[in-house]
């Protein structure tokens, strides 16, 4: 069987020049958000399927790359539904893993906790032009602070970062879902 040279649809190889730019940006992100007191954390790329799935189904359900159970847990002959076959999936964003992380580790973290995450995420939907199934995401959150000051700090830290990256004349829109 011949080796397929191109990556799977929606994935891409990253060449050295792009990696150099990416590393520069990631270092600037760590440095800038670190100066605002954000701590870098890392969560696994694989999460329990129950954490990734919402009870209502919906759009997020379609984003999950699901992972089959392995070994003795995988019983193909008696499976009646998808839940009998799948127990985990690749994260489609960094928010769900952060919720699990904070729930598991909050007793060992300062309050409020300022989290910085950068990592690959995967989306199982069919990618549109210019979009990918695997991509790097950056996320900052302040947990345990109920005032609007946390929201203001997120905006200030991000505008500082964008300025350091030489972005100008940008607009920040605030959404409340």
Residue spans of the language-model regions?
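TRNA-recognition modules of translation machinery and tRNA-sensing kinases, especially anticodon-binding
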Residues: 1-177
């Amino acid at each position: 069987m011949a080796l397929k040279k191109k990556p799977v649809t929606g994935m891409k190889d990253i060449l050295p020049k792009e990696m150099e730019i990416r590393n520069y940006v990631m270092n600037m992100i760590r440095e800038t958000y670190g100066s605002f007191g954000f701590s870098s954390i890392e969560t696994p790329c694989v999460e329990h399927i129950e954490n990734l799935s919402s009870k209502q189904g919906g759009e997020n359900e379609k984003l999950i790359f699901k992972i089959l159970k392995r070994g003795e847990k995988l019983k193909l002959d008696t499976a009646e539904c998808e839940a009998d076959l799948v127990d985990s999936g690749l994260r489609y964003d960094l928010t769900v893993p952060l919720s699990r992380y904070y729930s598991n580790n909050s007793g060992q973290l300062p309050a409020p906790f300022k989290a910085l995450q950068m990592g690959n995420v995967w989306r199982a939907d069919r990618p549109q032009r210019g979009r990918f199934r695997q991509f790097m995401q950056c996320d900052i959150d302040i947990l345990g602070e109920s005032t609007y000051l946390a929201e203001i700090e997120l905006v200030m830290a991000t505008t500082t970062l964008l300025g350091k990256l030489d972005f100008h004349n940008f607009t920040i829109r605030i959404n409340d879902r």
